Amino acid sequence: MKVKVGVNGYGTIGKRVAYAVTKQDDMELIGITKTKPDFEAYRAKELGIPVYAASEEFIPRFEKEGFEVAGTLNDLLEKVDIIVDATPGGIGAKNKPLYEKAGVKAIFQGGEKADVAEVSFVAQANYEAALGKNYVRVVSCNTTGLVRTLSAIREYADYVYAVMIRRAADPNDTKRGPINAIKPTVEVPSHHGPDVQTVIPINIETMAFVVPTTLMHVHSVMVELKKPLTKDDVIDIFENTTRVLLFEKEKGFDSTAQIIEFARDLHREWNNLYEIAVWKESINIKGNRLFYIQAVHQESDVIPENIDAIRAMFELADKWDSIKKTNKSLGILK
């Protein structure tokens, strides 16, 4: 039996999740929703994906352009087993009563507060916690990036301090900024630390800045260790951690630009880099402190987590079988 999946919201995350669903042999994409007939809606239709209006109020927008929709979100909910809510932050919580009324499982994204779901999720860290659940929240791109690497070294970590250098906007976003400033998040610590703690029990504090770039986030991480660990140990751990890749400055990876170019060279859709990129040379140990720097492709690192969450919620596979299946289907390198 294939799980019937709907995607509510077909923007940066939604269209990538929808694509990923089509690559699974145990899932079926039933349809997606849009609020207006923009180029993404037309492209979905060209791909043969049924397009639904996000609500009745948006139907006139489609009728005005002669764009025939398959129905509304409520109609889509009647046909699916699960809905992946990829709407803007805060909208998912407002949509939850619709999903509850329809008796449909739902996955929310990191823009929602943790209490929208029964569990916050990163597959390699807490897959089992989502088994059989009705509502799961896949944490944000930044939180996913932190959890991926920190969960791998958690047994050695006493306290984590991380500085988040966040991209200002996604490449197709013309509404956000800044374009000529560095904007600190003056609420210290930032929300990222507590968000990590919704997935793994770890002592962590974070600070954040927004900088004028669209490509990736960068994290500068310092870990106070409670157990001895060498640089080579950390390199070995990360080399054997799924969805984490080591990049070397000596091989030309001296910025996020080259890392994104690497993703383009893989010929992946939308130059997705599902893996967290760690600069190998940045891994260092001074006394009882571990340092490393990582980059996060904010448009795509959460996509495999959404797929694994679906499998966990329907208990289709155990943790590593699901991760391996997702990795293979999306061409994830390890």
Curated annotation (Swiss-Prot):
EC number: 1.2.1.59
Sequence positions that bind D-glyceraldehyde 3-phosphate: 140-142, 192-193
An annotated Gene Ontology molecular function: NADP binding
Compartments reported by the entry: Cytoplasm
Taxonomic superkingdom: Archaea
Protein's GO biological process: glycolytic process; lysine biosynthetic process via diaminopimelate
InterPro entries referenced in this protein's UniProt entry, alphabetically: DapB_N (IPR000846), GlycerAld/Erythrose_P_DH (IPR020831), GlycerAld_3-P_DH_AS (IPR020830), GlycerAld_3-P_DH_cat (IPR020829), GlycerAld_3-P_DH_NAD(P)-bd (IPR020828), Glyceraldehyde-3-P_DH_2_arc (IPR006436), NAD(P)-bd_dom_sf (IPR036291)
UniProt enzyme class: oxidoreductase
The reaction(s) this protein catalyses: D-glyceraldehyde 3-phosphate + phosphate + NADP(+) = (2R)-3-phospho-glyceroyl phosphate + NADPH + H(+); D-glyceraldehyde 3-phosphate + phosphate + NAD(+) = (2R)-3-phospho-glyceroyl phosphate + NADH + H(+)
A GO cellular-component term linked to this record: cytoplasm
Active site: 141
Pathway stated in the Swiss-Prot or TrEMBL entry: Carbohydrate degradation; glycolysis; pyruvate from D-glyceraldehyde 3-phosphate: step 1/5
Entry-linked SUPFAM superfamilies: Glyceraldehyde-3-phosphate dehydrogenase-like, C-terminal domain (SSF55347), NAD(P)-binding Rossmann-fold domains (SSF51735)
NADP among keywords: yes
UniProt entry keywords in alphabetical sequence: Cytoplasm, Glycolysis, NAD, NADP, Oxidoreductase
Binding residue positions for NAD(+): 12-13, 111, 167, 298
Quaternary assembly: Homotetramer.
Annotated HAMAP family: G3P_dehdrog_arch
UniProt family annotation: Belongs to the glyceraldehyde-3-phosphate dehydrogenase family.
Record-given protein name: Glyceraldehyde-3-phosphate dehydrogenase
Provenance organism: Pyrococcus horikoshii (strain ATCC 700860 / DSM 12428 / JCM 9974 / NBRC 100139 / OT-3)
Lineage: Archaea, Methanobacteriati, Methanobacteriota, Thermococci, Thermococcales
